[in-house]
């Protein structure tokens, strides 16, 4: 029977944590897929099973699932809850020396590439959707381009760990994914403001907004990282030091949001500072061990919960025949846009990039989309336009994680790490 009253935060948390724990056990015990992919596959199958039972007249299960999901604000859970910790945990183990070495491809792909990809996807969608009876205003297509273009660090970094990609390519993909989600969120929020107000901002306003939110987030993250570094260096007690990192992440993200700065970029910068300078100069071996262990567990647990939620949310989407075909073409459009951005970058700057020959294959296929895209599309105003974009977003995200995520390792193995990019 479906819930008849609102559940408390504790009850909702208990339900989803229990589901996640059970699915991770089933995956580890019987299936053996990477955890994030495995739990999402199982949760999708459960959702499809509930839908099928609903068609047969047994609709209690799907009613309960829908009612439960409606009481959960996915956008708030991810953007205001999980994201800060996941980004910090990811950046904590990224070598800043490697980032500096590959700063050119990371910078181009994360900043320019995100904007170019958003424009390409928006234009293609604008002309493709009317063929299937789903014409959308160009601004809505731009919103979709902005939310689907960033590669998701949560999805990318979890899968790259076991993909076998050459170190240089792994660094570029991980570095790009850590930064471009912040850029994508800023662009999305800017476009959403235009949609809500109906006013078209000037170029100066757009540039100022991007500079304040993105640039301010980076500077704020560096300041937070410096403060945290000096606090960690002044004591030697792993319990307090772990607590300081947790407080810095949650409190810092809240402050960044309050001051309208990019919280994601702030967390990335703070994670890089603590994970590099802090790890080398401000932590004892014992503290380093416990901080690494704590954030590894946080990363694994939150990732598992996130991908379970993505799988369960499938029941909220209604696909028609034409929309299903349009979703398939949208997957192709997203991949082609990614290929063009990566191809232009590697072709134009191949002498400066210092990447293995054929790196474009992994950079293209390894550009996974994930929970951030879902969280952003759920922020759109309710209506027919949002329903269309929600279906398209889920198609791209699920294909990205299941198909690209499971096969990117094979693509990576085809790259010889000792050869440099000469040409696509």
Give each language-model segment a name.
Residues 1-424:
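Transmembrane helical cores of multi-pass secondary ion antiporters/exchangers
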